[in-house]
Amino acid sequence: MIKKSIYLFGALILPLLVVWIFRMQYGYIYHAVDDVTINYSIINGESMLLPYIGIVLTKTLVIIQNIFPMINIYFIFLVGTYSISFSVFIFLLRKRKCKILLIVILLIIEFTLLKYFTYSVVAYLLATSGVLLLYKEEKTILSSIIIFVGFSLRVQVIVSVILLLLGIVLYELIVNKKKEKTVYLAIVTTLVIVTNFIFVKTNSEVENYITWNNKSTLIRDYPEINYNEYKDKLANENISKNDLESYNAWIFAEKNVFSNNMLDRLDEIRDNSKKYDLSIKNNIIQIFSNELLKVFIYFIVLIPLLYRPKKIFGHLSLVMPIALIVLLSIRQRMVERVYIPLIVIFIFSFIIYLQDIFEKRNYRLLRGTENIIFSILSLIMLNNAIQYGTDNLYWFVHQSFPHNKVYNELLKNNEKNLYIFAGYGNIINSQPNVSKVFVEKDKLTKNMLTLGNWQTFTPQYKEKLDDLNVSDSNNLLSSALDSDNIKFVLPEKSGLMEKVKTLFKEHYNKDVNFIFQEKVDEEVNVYVLRSDVSE
């Protein structure tokens, strides 16, 4: 009993300790703009983060944030769920003979994966740990909660996780007859999807935003449209070079220009051959030119050499991660924060289900040393992957938070004005660090925006503009023209200025200029947008 208690305590504490060590060693832990954006939203009580985070989860986080306003609930939640997922993996290894070695490997992977600490990665880990806990243990309620939170944290991971674990799910359903647990998995998954669907369909403002955002995402997630290649087609659709360049530069907070219809026409400019790379040669080159994927494929090939897959279940477990990676390549979406968590959750599920869906081949020459050989070769591959990431992907580099006090004071001293920045990075720098438990909330402001991000046109976006007396929340640029309380914080030679000027000339036949108001620092000034004013 004591040993079991100690093991459980260690399983809970060790992953948290790893996060703490990484935080102390390498500093700032948020590596994606999205997590900072979400963190601001939760602190500010904004509970609509669809289509990415489920409505039940965000509302719950906002309620808890309101109860405990002095602490950063989202940061605690993200670190906690990241650690809990590894705690579950460690717990599931408690009966394995070589559990110490496996736990060390898990903790090394956890430490390394913190380089990609984002809500998407946490969602993959948490949902996977919940599914494995559901089938391996008699903890239906706990595992169902973990699955629900994991799938709610990033709704888009549902399909990938289910496909990756398909061999395991079918094994448990067909061989172990765990129909009831499979039904629980189906119910929880459906609950996440249905609650979001009902919320969207019963809120017209949210539905309008989701519709627009889906159209916008269709364009942004594919390779950028080259103007010269589609010049004639774009001209036929009355889409100018400046329209395309503005959109690609995330300048689209003007629905009179970037309407649903315009986005549909822009998306239809390319045929599917430009969106999806179906060339076998190109995909092979794409995958094998990636050192991490190359190591992973070697690992996949090594498994059936030493372990015989049991029927279709083992084969599916090996095929699905490769299939998902190939689909990413075809989709031209081969980004580290997507394929690395897929690799990691495959490794974890393989470790936990090795004895269930694989069996040793028992080569006479190896004389029962298959496990030792496999462990040594796997450690060599892991070392090579970490070495490559360290040398080429900056995995272990200290990052500090570049807080800009001048920007922050500008916003704090002029709270009735709306300040538009050229990039979201400048907005992040203008705010206090939210990558910690206690945030300096007195330094947080709401009166800043960019001309386009994934929250543009959300209900909270429109509410923010209404609070700042912006005349038309669907057309921020038009509202900014000749306004005294909408200002731009830009470098003196910002490319944004020319794009906005051209947009007004092409779509409204108006000549506009950015008029200097005050200096912020050596490189950045505050401007207002005025009509019919010569330079």
Please provide the spans of the model-predicted regions:
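Signature aromatic-anchored transmembrane alpha helix within multi-pass, membrane-resident enzymes
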Residues: 100, 180-190, 358-387
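Extracytoplasmic
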Residues: 396-404, 412-416, 423-483, 498-518
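Transmembrane alpha-helix segments characteristic
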Residues: 102-107, 309-328
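Hydrophobic/aromatic-rich transmembrane helices and adjacent perimembrane loops
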Residues: 123-124, 159, 324-325, 331-355
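Membrane-embedded, lumen/periplasm-facing catalytic core of multi-pass transferases
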Residues: 198-236, 379-451
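Hydrophobic, aromatic-rich transmembrane alpha-helices
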Residues: 85-91, 279-311
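Membrane-interface alpha helices of multi-pass inner-membrane proteins
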Residues: 108-110, 140-157, 161-166, 186-198
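Extracytoplasmic catalytic/substrate-binding loops of multi-pass membrane glycan-assembly enzymes
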Residues: 19-40, 46-61, 68-72, 397-399
